[in-house]
């Protein structure tokens, strides 16, 4: 007996291939996209513009399965954090950040993270595996259903758990669905992928996907970046910065956004700002300064408001479009760098971290009843 297929795990070309294999015209793929993603219907019997024989055919050959909601927390500022349970019982976190006329969904790409950035809670939890397409787009599907009016997803950022470009195929396929007119219909300007700098995958992404790019920079030189982002030892700034400079054509008016976490006494001095100015001198870019969000066991501390203000002014005086990202959801451990999830670490990294600190920092998350 042929194993049933989860339609949520198919890219648009794969869905069209599945439809063709069922002897159906290709427009059926469009209908299924609309039913599943726009209307949120997973029961084939309710897809009323499909013939009854085809609905029966679908139920025999396929299904639609999304992750399950395990827990939810809502911040005092309106930020939502969800813990989603996967089929293998690993759990990931997804965050929704409302802000005036926009609502940003922060989506995870891995169970844990394959990288081990020193300032990020996710990295300390270790790594289990890449998420499937169904598990990535399923976060968007679930969030759209869970949010109550007036909340609405207007932007998606691949900035949750994991390094997106180490899960390239599934992430790019998911972003394509986010932008598809018959799925979520988001503009390419409203879907952003954030990377720590996986150079080969960045080059490929530039050719294959029109999404906006953000780069986790966090340091103005290799010596410091090697400490904060160990990946820099493989892909250093002399490779990363030229690629960012030429990532978008000069005539497009688009540019890379650099993310820079502000850590007291480490990368927040005036000398660091001046070094950053020299590093990015000819790079069309925007800079987001991110106040460091603490997590249990870290020795890092957030820069003072005064230090952040001086750093920002120095960059702006040099002509850089620089903003300070407002911290959201930190009271529910939903802010940048705080996501942890609950999963089996296959690397042993979390246990080594626990032994080093003398505590287990895998935080329990109180539930909200549904």
Curated annotation (Swiss-Prot):
Domain Radical SAM core: 99-331
Organism of this sequence: Coxiella burnetii (strain RSA 493 / Nine Mile phase I)
Cofactor binding comment, as recorded: Binds 1 [4Fe-4S] cluster. The cluster is coordinated with 3 cysteines and an exchangeable S-adenosyl-L-methionine.
List of catalytic residues: 93, 336
Designated name of the protein: Dual-specificity RNA methyltransferase RlmN
Catalytic activity: adenosine(2503) in 23S rRNA + 2 reduced [2Fe-2S]-[ferredoxin] + 2 S-adenosyl-L-methionine = 2-methyladenosine(2503) in 23S rRNA + 5'-deoxyadenosine + L-methionine + 2 oxidized [2Fe-2S]-[ferredoxin] + S-adenosyl-L-homocysteine; adenosine(37) in tRNA + 2 reduced [2Fe-2S]-[ferredoxin] + 2 S-adenosyl-L-methionine = 2-methyladenosine(37) in tRNA + 5'-deoxyadenosine + L-methionine + 2 oxidized [2Fe-2S]-[ferredoxin] + S-adenosyl-L-homocysteine
Further information: Reaction proceeds by a ping-pong mechanism involving intermediate methylation of a conserved cysteine residue.
Record: residues binding [4Fe-4S] cluster: 113, 117, 120
């Amino acid at each position: 007996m042929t194993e049933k297929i989860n339609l949520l795990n198919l890219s648009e070309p794969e869905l069209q291939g599945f439809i063709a294999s069922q002897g159906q015209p290709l427009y059926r793929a469009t209908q299924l996209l609309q039913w599943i993603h726009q209307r949120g219907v997973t029961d084939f019997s309710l897809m009323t513009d499909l013939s009854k024989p085809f609905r029966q055919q679908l139920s025999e050959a396929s299904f639609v399965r999304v992750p399950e909601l395990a827990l939810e927390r809502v911040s005092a500022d309106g930020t939502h954090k969800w813990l989603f349970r996967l089929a293998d019982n690993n759990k990931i976190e997804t965050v929704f950040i409302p802000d005036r006329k926009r609502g940003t969904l922060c989506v995870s790409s891995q169970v844990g993270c394959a990288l081990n950035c020193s300032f990020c809670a996710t990295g300390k939890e270790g790594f289990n595996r890449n998420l499937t397409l169904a598990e990535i787009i399923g976060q968007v599907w679930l969030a759209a259903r869970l949010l109550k009016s007036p909340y609405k997803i207007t932007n998606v950022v691949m900035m949750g758990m994991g390094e997106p470009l180490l899960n390239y195929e599934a992430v790019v396929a998911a972003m394509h669905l986010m932008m598809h007119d018959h799925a979520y219909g988001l503009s390419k300007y409203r879907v952003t992928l954030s990377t720590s700098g996986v150079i080969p995958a960045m080059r490929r992404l530039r050719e294959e996907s029109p999404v906006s790019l953000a780069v986790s920079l966090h340091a103005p030189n290799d010596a410091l970046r090697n400490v904060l982002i160990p990946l820099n030892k493989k892909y250093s700034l002399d490779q990363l910065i030229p690629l960012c400079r030429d990532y978008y054509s000069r005539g497009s008016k688009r540019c890379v956004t650099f993310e820079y976490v502000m850590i007291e006494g480490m990368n927040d001095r005036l000398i660091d700002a001046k070094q950053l100015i020299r590093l990015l001198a000819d790079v069309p870019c925007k800079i987001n300064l991110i106040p460091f969000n603490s997590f249990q066991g870290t020795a890092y501390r957030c820069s003072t408001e005064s230090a952040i203000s001086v750093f920002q002014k120095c960059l702006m005086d040099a002509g850089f479009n620089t903003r300070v990202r407002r911290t959201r959801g930190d009271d529910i451990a939903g802010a940048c760098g705080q996501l942890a999830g609950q999963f089996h670490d296959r690397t042993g990294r979390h246990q080594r971290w626990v032994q080093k600190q003398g505590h287990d920092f895998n935080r329990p998350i109180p539930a909200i009843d549904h």
